[in-house]
């Protein structure tokens, strides 16, 4: 065989290994995610730039490639383009005053053409506060909704889930809660995840119309935005909340909703060829929500005393709370409000199913007077639901059972509440006092709503009610003068219905 001299030197090409540690190239593009070679020093959640102008974040690391999610939706990225890691992890820009801001995942202002520059930034992903820095939940966060504040109260620093079918009133509860924080020294953050742009604009307009944007921030991504932006949005909202919490402020953050967040994450992981699990969600679906919601805490005084109260929302299908994502978030949070479509369609708004709803720690933060007036309300409603089924079949009930039915029917009517009409603490006390002391016993259920409206009108007209409202935070029980005032108001309001 003829000898062949093979000179490998002529094929030698210089490879800059140092360059490949911080740089790479686009090898593949797939529906908003890219696969890059190189980037040996890359870290999870590190910010990158593609071709020096497109923003991305590292979401996947393996031996073959680095998976990058594109923050901006674009068709301008091509295979072979350069990819470079930055010197920071993904973060959201902050402004000196966050009230009234509408921002995207990275803190870029939306619907605002001003050239104001950010003054700081906050990382989207960080560790949960150490347990020694956390305090107990002892202060109430009033929603202004009678059924919630009395039966399933929420405390500052709590995580309370709202779940229910589409069009069952989840967002309306959140909006009412934000509006009720007026003059309560609570900064509100509404996080819209993958919603229609028109729907987001409608919520913002409602908040602005009621003056709530004066103490609120909106972090939003629309359904038309990239999957990565939708996935990162709740973390951006939490990063803003943490920056405010570190200033000693109380923050309320609404996630609308985490079902769409889980869907966006599922799509991203499937694009990265991760093995699907239950309902095709990846195995770390629990982690993405627990790592987010566990950042909502009440800090102790040594660490500023600020708090983050988180109200995530989950959309159910056919009132099924046993699906994968609902059960995950139920186990992460400190309680849940289950909104039932059947109640909503019957006109019971807010449509809270008291039998399934619970607040595990909110009772410790409830106002002591409301706690005392609310102690047996859950039992009354539960008995009413049981006995009502017997009445539907025409069964005769004894006097004791009929009283339970009457009380339950009255309480159900009292808990009906028009949208955008939150109740103050003293208004709720007045309503509950009227119920608990038998002033509604002989009233027709059809008159309860009219009576409630007149009751609140008479309360605000009473000369001592304003003083009672101003002192309510310092009052732990009703004295004789308070009782006399409440009974005068209730008797005057009840005269037209006697």
Curated annotation (Swiss-Prot):
InterPro entries reported for this sequence:
ATP_synth_asu-like_sf (IPR023366), ATP_synth_asu_C (IPR000793), ATP_synth_asu_C_sf (IPR038376), ATP_synth_F1_a_nt-bd_dom (IPR033732), ATP_synth_F1_asu (IPR005294), ATPase_a/bsu_AS (IPR020003), ATPase_F1/V1/A1_a/bsu_N_sf (IPR036121), ATPase_F1/V1/A1_a/bsu_nucl-bd (IPR000194)
Subunit-structure text = F-type ATPases have 2 components, CF(1) - the catalytic core - and CF(0) - the membrane proton channel. CF(1) has five subunits: alpha(3), beta(3), gamma(1), delta(1), epsilon(1). CF(0) has three main subunits: a(1), b(2) and c(9-12). The alpha and beta chains form an alternating ring which encloses part of the gamma chain. CF(1) is attached to CF(0) by a central stalk formed by the gamma and epsilon chains, while a peripheral stalk is formed by the delta and b chains.
The UniProt keyword set, sorted, is: ATP synthesis, ATP-binding, Cell membrane, CF(1), Hydrogen ion transport, Ion transport, Membrane, Nucleotide-binding, Translocase, Transport
How does the record classify its membrane topology?
Peripheral membrane protein
Gene Ontology cellular-component terms for this entry are: plasma membrane; proton-transporting ATP synthase complex
Q: Which HAMAP family match?
A: ATP_synth_alpha_bact
Main site of residence?
Answer: membrane
On whether Lipid biosynthesis is a keyword of this UniProt record, the answer is: no
Query: By its UniProt entry, which PANTHER family does this protein fall under?
Result: ATP SYNTHASE SUBUNIT ALPHA, MITOCHONDRIAL
Q: Which reaction does it catalyse?
A: ATP + H2O + 4 H(+)(in) = ADP + phosphate + 5 H(+)(out)
Positions marked as site (Required for activity): 357
Q: What does this protein do?
A: Produces ATP from ADP in the presence of a proton gradient across the membrane. The alpha chain is a regulatory subunit.
The record's GO molecular-function terms, alphabetically, read:
ADP binding; ATP binding; proton-transporting ATP synthase activity, rotational mechanism
What Enzyme Commission number does this protein have? 7.1.2.2
In the record, the note on similarity to other proteins reads:
Belongs to the ATPase alpha/beta chains family.
Where is it localised? Cell membrane
Q: Which PROSITE patterns match?
A: ATPASE_ALPHA_BETA
Which protein are we looking at? ATP synthase subunit alpha 1
Extract the NCBIfam families matched here: atpA, PRK13343.1
